[in-house]
């Protein structure tokens, strides 16, 4: 888009979206396509199946944007109101495209619905000068229409497979020719572990005000990401903008950064162990196998991961990991002493180079003043029987799966840092 353009908006239509009955994957996918085209995508809106509300939103968008892309509401039922609402927004009538009705009848000629598809005729009505977007996968066409100068609407059905096909076969070329310039967006994402989003943001306040490239932090559970995005004519030009910022961030945060883009913490750990030709095993209690699952979700994990013993009960800690009843009684299952013994013993039993043991109270019950919900002990046993013990107390307001997930993250990141220190 040219520098004086007002941008693109996405309008998702459907009460099921507002109620959370379905996830709006269409808006995400369209956003990605717009980014690849270098278009200025400023806003997304969602509205239910109410004609007056749809009209109000469309009229507002027409005053501030150049291009509106809608999904949903093109079907044959009474609550499919998109085309009608668009026409009313600009006080125009709808006219039947008779050839579309012929095409629909042809599509359904061998269908069991052929005697009951008269309601589909509704899908053949459009503003007089609208360009039709053919729907090869369904019966609801879309349209390209410029109701007022400088404002264009593209409509798509809500079915993702239909929308994507229509986009790729018809809409993409139109958007490229009319709205896209030679610029595209290119991004590089740095991934952090062991540091919070607010701490990261405080340290890079100056970078957050950059215009090109832009720097944006966002967080997942146990992980912070910094996305550096440049608008440029080529990947080389974009990298020239992105790389100086990336190097500054790497210098600032050093070991907190575990990877980029599609890297994952388990994947990075597996690669490092494979380079060292070393193996790992786990002894899990409070995570119940989640630590093992995180590793085995990565292709190639069998190179380094030998197996795991999940000892949820004290009896199994005793019988499978040789943790004495005396030690369990004296210190409790959730303790540094027991966790350290779990790591040492599973490493010896399964004959690995490294072992991680974890025991904790994931809640919501089971905590006390001395050992609250959220308390987790982690022990890492390495070559030469070197032991690293870690104690974490996660916020007790977190739910069970959050505490388990954060615990797994600490396990993986702690071993990553140990291996990193051994490089130096």
Swiss-Prot record:
PANTHER family tied to this protein: NICOTINAMIDE-NUCLEOTIDE AMIDOHYDROLASE PNCC, NMN AMIDOHYDROLASE-LIKE PROTEIN YFAY
CDD domains noted in UniProt: cinA
Protein name: CinA-like protein
InterPro entries linked to this entry: CinA, CinA-like_C, CinA_C, CinA_KH, Competence-induced_CinA, MoaB/Mog-like_dom_sf, MoaB/Mog_dom
Family: Belongs to the CinA family.
Pfam families to which the protein is assigned, alphabetical: CinA, CinA_KH, MoCF_biosynth
Record organism: Prochlorococcus marinus (strain MIT 9312)
HAMAP family per the UniProt record, alphabetical: CinA_B
NCBIfam families noted in UniProt: cinA_nterm, molyb_syn, PncC_domain, PRK00549.1
SUPFAM superfamilies per the UniProt record, alphabetical: CinA-like (SSF142433), Molybdenum cofactor biosynthesis proteins (SSF53218)
